[in-house]
Regions:
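Alpha/beta-hydrolase fold catalytic core
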Residues: 1-33, 51-58, 83-94, 248, ...
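Short beta-strand/loop motif that positions the catalytic acidic residue
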Residues: 215, 221-223, 227
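Active-site loop/oxyanion-hole signature of alpha/beta-hydrolase fold enzymes
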Residues: 27, 47-51, 60-98, 112, ...
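Active-site glycine-rich loops that stabilize anionic/oxyanionic intermediates
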Residues: 38-41, 101
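Flexible "cap/lid" loop of the alpha/beta hydrolase fold
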Residues: 112-113, 117-154, 195
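Conserved alpha/beta-hydrolase catalytic His-Asp/Glu region
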Residues: 153-206, 210-211
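Catalytic histidine-centered segment of alpha/beta-hydrolase-like enzymes
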Residues: 253-266
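Gly/Ala-rich beta-loop-alpha elbow adjacent to hydrolase catalytic centers
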Residues: 99-103, 107
């Protein structure tokens, strides 16, 4: 597709059946920007943000494997997810990548494995490690994440709705953002419970702390000061560990500041993605 657009346009209109096939929607003109969403959701959630970004960028909004219109990879691992996303995004000039939550871990892994392809990173409410441990207090307890996996098989929809509520817990304002997330949750079908459970396993296993100092791309780390899933302390740690990173914290925001605080989020992102 060429030219600017007023809304997202689909490169892959139908749910793909081939393992690893990835759905990408591309819109706008300018330097390329890839958007990577979080667990259990899909790229449709970026909708409110797209007009601002597409005014300055050629935006490629990706449904991560196993989510939205994208098939799961086989095997379903972080490395295979990264490889599938890399294969789906058009080849051209180096990319800016904005990753939220799980998408941030995908973005960091991609930047580490393909440093010539990724020019800069924006990491939103993400963490090098999503479960707490003796040497990492900046995360949820492992038992909490495990309980989500157990509950998926018992009360699938209720568990996902509760997860959405946790993302905006304490956010001010959060009610409108939560309504938007609920509207989009099943807009591209219901993700397979076994795939979401496997994705939780990936989240539980992620530990990118040793890799962070070797991710040299210019990086903007953005956190919500009320985020309980990826606490701001995790973002501050990332910004300090990465060699060319800056940090911004959005007051009153939970885990989805681009929805609850769009103007503050746009200010925090600033001209960073444009290389200025």
């Amino acid at each position: 597709m060429t030219g600017a657009a007023t809304g997202p346009q689909s490169r892959t209109g139908e749910r793909p059946s081939a393992p690893g096939r990835v759905h990408v929607e591309s819109v706008g003109q300018g330097p390329p920007l890839v958007l990577l969403h979080g667990w259990a959701l899909h790229s449709g959630l970026w909708g409110p943000l797209l007009p601002r970004l597409a005014a300055r960028h050629r935006v490629h909004a990706v449904d991560l494997p196993g989510h939205g219109h994208s098939a799961a990879t086989d095997p379903f691992t972080l490395e295979e997810i990264v490889a599938a996303v890399d294969a789906a995004v058009p080849v051209g000039e180096p990319l800016a990548v904005l990753g939220w939550s799980l998408g941030g871990a995908v973005a960091m892994t991609w930047a580490r494995s393909q440093p010539a392809r990724i020019a800069r990173l924006a990491l939103v409410c993400t963490s090098p490690r999503f479960v707490a441990g003796p040497d990492w207090p900046h995360a949820m307890a492992a038992a909490t994440l495990s309980r989500f996996g157990d509950e998926l098989s018992v009360a699938y929809r209720a568990t996902l709705q509760r997860f959405l509520s946790l993302q905006l817990h304490g956010s001010d304002p959060g009610r409108a953002a939560l309504a938007l997330m609920r509207k989009h949750l099943f807009a591209r079908g219901e993700p397979a419970p076994e795939v979401l459970g496997a994705a939780l396993g990936i989240l539980a296993a992620i530990d990118l702390r040793a890799d962070a100092p070797s991710i040299a791309q210019p990086t903007r780390v953005i956190a919500g000061d009320r985020d309980t899933l990826a606490p701001p302390a995790a973002g501050r740690w990332l910004a300090a560990a990465m060699p060319d990173a800056t940090y911004a914290e959005i007051g009153g925001a939970g885990h989805a500041p681009f929805l609850s605080h769009p103007d503050a989020f746009d200010h925090a992102l600033g001209a960073f993605l444009d290389g200025r």
